[in-house]
Amino acid sequence: MSAAQSAVRSHAEAVQVSRTIDWMALFVVFFVIVGSYHIHAMLTMGDWDFWSDWKDRRLWVTVTPIVLVTFPAAVQSYLWERYRLPWGATVCVLGLLLGEWINRYFNFWGWTYFPINFVFPASLVPGAIILDTVLMLSGSYLFTAIVGAMGWGLIFYPGNWPIIAPLHVPVEYNGMLMSIADIQGYNYVRTGTPEYIRMVEKGTLRTFGKDVAPVSAFFSAFMSILIYFMWHFIGRWFSNERFLQST
């Protein structure tokens, strides 16, 4: 076969080759997004989501939704702009959870023997469903940024409460009152640097009363609106068509 001849012999074979290339491209793009989103998550909210004794009512509730609304906004905008697919945020979050569970099982448990109920990742699926549903029903990025991103921030703590509630039960341990998550932190020693020597319910944000989770959630929701609005432009930028002019 010469260089000028086609590598396929029929239209059906050409279609099959095209579909194979599409699946290979989707496979590569999916894991590139999973890897980059996972690295972004680990470098930003990292420790607050690594350990059960860091999943508190103040910083974990505030930081995690703000820094993780980025990739869902961009991917959702791209898929909606190009293909009118309303599940970009959900697919993005499911990919992140896949990468996190692989990391927690093989690295945290397989190499360092931290138990899974000490290093489990947070659930972001409820917020992603809200983002996709609002965009699908409204078709407006502005409305999705205001309502959807606010729902993303507000639903984060209630969506994870069934998972972390058993670890926040107060117990007496050696004459001290602490949570089960704090006991896990004492028994599974990590690094000795000062930022790891903390207790989950010793925060200082007590101006608004006893429970600070609603304050943290509303602040996180407000910031998520701004971050979503900025990052959705990245997805729209990637969805633009560009042509090279012939000379």
Swiss-Prot record:
It is found in: Membrane. Its main location: membrane. It catalyses: methane + a quinol + O2 = methanol + a quinone + H2O. Keywords: Membrane, Monooxygenase, Oxidoreductase, Transmembrane, Transmembrane helix. The keyword Oxidoreductase applies. Products of both gene copies, pmoA1 and pmoA2, are required for full cellular activity. It is a multi-pass membrane protein. The lineage of its organism: Bacteria, Pseudomonadati, Pseudomonadota, Gammaproteobacteria, Methylococcales. M.capsulatus has two forms of methane monooxygenase, a soluble (sMMO) and a membrane-bound (particulate) type (pMMO). The particulate type is a nonamer composed of three alpha:beta:gamma heterotrimeric protomers assembled into a cylindrical structure; the beta and gamma subunits comprise the bulk of the membrane-spanning regions and the soluble regions are derived primarily from alpha subunits which form two antiparallel beta-barrel-like structures each. GO terms for cellular component: membrane. Its EC number is 1.14.18.3. This is Particulate methane monooxygenase beta subunit. The chain crosses the membrane at residues 23-43, 59-79, 86-106, 111-131, 145-165, 215-235. InterPro entries: NH3/CH4_mOase_suA_sf, NH3_CH4_mOase_A. One of its GO terms (molecular function) is monooxygenase activity. Non-catalytic subunit of the methane monooxygenase that is responsible for the initial oxygenation of methane to methanol in methanotrophs. At least in vitro, specific quinols can replace NADH as reductants.
